[in-house]
Amino acid sequence: MVTEPSKVLDYKFLIGGRNYNMDLGKAKYISENTDFVKWKELSSRAKINLNLVHELHANTYATSTARIFELSALRCCIVSSPYQGLERWFEPKKEILIANSTEEVIEIYQTLMEDSELRLKIGLAAEKRVKKDHTARNRVQQVIDIIRKCQNKL
């Protein structure tokens, strides 16, 4: 989602987070230790934010880091690598875009970079969804519901 597209597209790619000592193409590695305030600023300014999923999350149904929810709350337009259960949280093609191949991700990047209204539309839809379905209150209620369900089985 980064290496090859950054070599063929004339866009600025910035990567933050852990440095996995991999070929980043022409992407610039920022830092592993970007504080949250700076991260919010960079994410909000970016035209496209990537959700790069580790193999563990990709292959374990409905697992994720908080990052996808944080980006959505910031109204970011997100392109994600695929993983099992993602559609449980966000509607693909409406609230998030999923790239399954290098060719597909290049096409998605080109489309988004040429269409600011589409980026805004996706970001707004993701923000609306996260504020509706993915708040701390929602998670607490889910835990309560699970506990009640377990108690009823006893």
Q: What feature does the model see in each segment?
A:
Residues M1-I68, A73-V79, Y83-L86, C150:
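Nucleotide-sugar donor-binding catalytic core of glycosyltransferases
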Residues V37-K38, E104-E107:
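Short acidic active-site motifs
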Residues P92-K93:
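Glycine-centered loop/turn motifs
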Residues M113-D145:
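A charged, aromatic-enriched C-terminal amphipathic alpha-helix characteristic of glycosyltransferases
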Residues R148-L154:
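Generic C-terminal helix-cap and adjacent flexible tail
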